[in-house]
């Protein structure tokens, strides 16, 4: 059994030009200070080809990865429980590897994070593929559209260059899910904070799209690394 932890605090200074972005008047009208996350993660291996993980964020009061996995060999595995869904290279990347204080706005608005479900995944030296069927998140998600509703996801990637200091990554993903709110309403709504995850304001917000049926997202992703230079886009 191994133990991991991550504590992060953020400080924001805004230059407001449309609306007040601060979420806490005590911090000031153009600043926010506070604990961003306090993650505790337990991981275990065995017996045999079994693995498990249990993660919790005390700051957000929600479960993170919470699943068991069986590896058929060094390449193919089945996972049951809560895990990140197969979409968005940036969303799938660990928080500790983020390049900036916040993920890109398109990732935060459209990327699917953790849901309960089952997936099969294979990873070769230069390519990989994942298929997943999922339900709701363990902890109710504040996102009106991305925390509830059954669906499925597919993702594949190819890395013709994959060595230390030299990487070329190309990927394609697809998510198809029910448009459901936490109250089981058939609504959809996409919104995103302004590159500052502690702000309560959403500068991009579709509002409630009522009588919605499904949300379908197709993702294209690419990444290039050469020595100290990195380029990534989705």
State the predicted function of each range.
Residues 148-234:
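Surface-exposed beta-loop-beta
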């Amino acid at each position: 059994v191994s133990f991991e932890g991550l504590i992060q605090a953020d400080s924001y200074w805004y230059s407001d030009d449309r609306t007040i972005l601060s979420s806490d008047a005590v911090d000031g009208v153009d600043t926010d200070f506070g604990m961003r996350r306090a993650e505790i993660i337990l991981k275990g291996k065995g017996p045999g080809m079994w693995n498990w993980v249990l993660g919790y964020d005390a700051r957000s009061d929600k479960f993170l990865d919470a699943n068991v996995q069986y590896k058929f060999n060094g390449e193919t595995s089945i996972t049951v429980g809560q895990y990140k869904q197969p979409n968005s290279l940036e969303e799938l990347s660990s928080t500790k590897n983020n390049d900036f204080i916040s993920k890109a706005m398109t990732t935060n608005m459209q990327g699917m994070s953790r849901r309960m479900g089952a997936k099969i995944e294979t990873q070769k030296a230069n390519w990989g593929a994942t298929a997943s069927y999922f339900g709701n998140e363990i902890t109710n998600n504040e996102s009106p559209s991305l925390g509830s509703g059954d669906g499925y996801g597919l993702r594949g990637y190819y890395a013709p260059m994959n060595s230390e200091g030299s990487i070329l990554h190309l990927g394609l993903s697809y998510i198809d899910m029910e448009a459901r709110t936490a109250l089981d309403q058939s609504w959809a709504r996409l919104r995103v904070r302004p590159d500052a995850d502690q702000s309560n304001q959403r500068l991009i917000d579709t509002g409630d799209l009522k009588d919605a049926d499904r949300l379908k997202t197709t993702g294209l992703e690419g990444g290039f690394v050469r020595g100290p230079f990195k380029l990534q886009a989705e």
